[in-house]
């Protein structure tokens, strides 16, 4: 249950590091909060804030820095997430996209807490993708493929195994050993699901009902081609760069999470691009039943750029749970 706004306003703000965040949110909570917030996106209970970003060149490397924000009235929470995309970070043994979430009380504007949002971003992205893609299913989705075995790929496998009635999950990665590790992490979650690892993307997606791409490719790449897919496959593209071929963008029924954000992030959906004027609606429309799925045999492409209000919703719940558990570092004396 959401924390009492009056108590939140009076309590000292807290800081939660990555381990504390993990201790304060179960996988079930993450999936449920993300699903509910997505369904509520077109209501006055959830407000999407602005998304902004800019490029910075430092020591021969290019970084993208940005922020996403929003407000969840049911939790009396408003906030912002600051993130940086650094392709050099993995070679430094650092996360590619570090993130920090700041949550305030929506009624008073007082700081509620600050938390490490790096792993939580991967969790919410995967939960969002699985929830949105499953809502696009026109028949039982039994076979899934995940292309990419990084943090988001691991979380995708986990949420697929835990929340969907799939029979098989194939994980494809440049290194088969990396894909195998993603399978091992999810193996204990549910019996009856077959997990397989491969470095062959085409083989992984060939008979999949649903395909997720979540890689860190540095440039646009035809990782998944329309010709390899089932005629009615659902493809969910999550990476910063293009991970599917132009043919798929040109022929698929396209749904996005944030039309403006997707156009800002992905040139294919700007004027003149293959996806220009091909977006039929957003995820909230699908999940709330306001947008009906195509009746014929047609591929569906989900292009998800991320919605900041999901981070705020998860951050607010983590902070509320932390207070109940006595977890977190107080940032100032108690206001009560």
Residue ranges and their predicted role:
Residues 143-144, 169:
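Conserved hydrophobic helix-helix packing surfaces used for dimerization/oligomerization
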Residues 136-143, 230-231:
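Short helix-loop-beta connector
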Residues 149-150:
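Glycine-rich Rossmann-fold phosphate-binding loop(s) that bind the pyrophosphate
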Residues 18-22, 241, 247-336:
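Adenosine-phosphate binding glycine-rich loop
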Residues 191-271:
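Rossmann-like adenosine-cofactor binding region
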Residues 153-154:
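N-terminal Rossmann-fold NAD(P) dinucleotide-binding loop
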Residues 162-189:
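NAD(P)-binding Rossmann-fold cofactor-contacting core
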Residues 1-122, 130, 140, 309-312:
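N-terminal ligand-binding/catalytic initiation module
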